[in-house]
Amino acid sequence: MTTPPRGTAAPPTGDALEAPGPLLMLLETRAPWEAAAMVAASPWLARLPRGDGHPVVVFPGLGASDITTLPLRRFLRRRGYSPYAWNLGFNLGPRPGVLDNCRSLVQQAAHRHGERVSLIGWSLGGIYAREIAKEQPQHARCVITLGTPFAGHPRATNAWRFYQKVSGQVMHDEAMLEQLRMAPACPTTSIYSRSDGVVAWPCSLNPDAAHTENVEIQASHLGMGMNPLALYAIADRLAQDPASWRRFDIHGARRWFYKVPVRAPRPVVAAAA
């Protein structure tokens, strides 16, 4: 196993990886404060570099709809990008037709703008973003996920029962889980929080590769898409030229807000209960 960077601890694996406990779940009540912080941070966020107008498709989390990603999409539009909602109502899992519609949306955005598309996914939406980028590498500019559990067993989250109920799917196929762990070929960023009350944070760690990274912030799972630190990192990542992509720089004042990145040396898997 690769030694983790100095100042970090290796993430728990196997039986040690469990869903967040009651205290972290209680901390999810801070989400409204993160929305308020987004408003308060507007002058700071307005100083970020303008975007180049390229299309950005945003996928909502499990049980959520485009309403939850509206603040993020408004932020992206103000920064000069061309954001797209997924327009499929509530995200109740990859039920029949859902992924086909997502694929079509990305293709249409790419053709309309004549350039590749950045894909942003919150929680389960990040799974869609990653998988579509793998299927359509010719259309994917970059992938950014927010609290997405792509690297661990579904039972290392507090949403797995709800997922099974609304989607009608049981995720115990090891081949499928292995597929989810693989990063897309394009630059791929995972924004995660150790205080996430829904997803065990090691489930959101990209394995170490030249085109992957993990950016740690202090955020709730439910408020991550409105958290000013997440928005800042998203804008920074979208402004990167894929041809000369570099990992998120946490030198200077950023060290006060972002943690030393952790890169998983190997896929993180929890034993099924």
Residue ranges and their predicted role:
Residues 30-39, 60-69, 189-200:
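Phosphate-binding glycine-rich loops and adjacent basic patches that engage nucleotide phosphates
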Residues 1-56, 69, 74, 79, ...:
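Flexible, membrane-associating and regulatory peripheral segments of lipid-active enzymes
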Residues 54-67, 71, 75-186, 191, ...:
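Serine-dependent carboxylesterase/thioesterase catalytic core
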Residues 13, 45-46, 106, 132, ...:
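Hydrophobic alpha-helical segments, principally membrane-spanning helices and signal/leader peptides
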Residues 9, 13-16, 20, 40-46, ...:
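Generic preference for well-ordered secondary structure
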Residues 134-273:
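Helical cap/lid subdomain of alpha/beta-hydrolase-fold lipid enzymes
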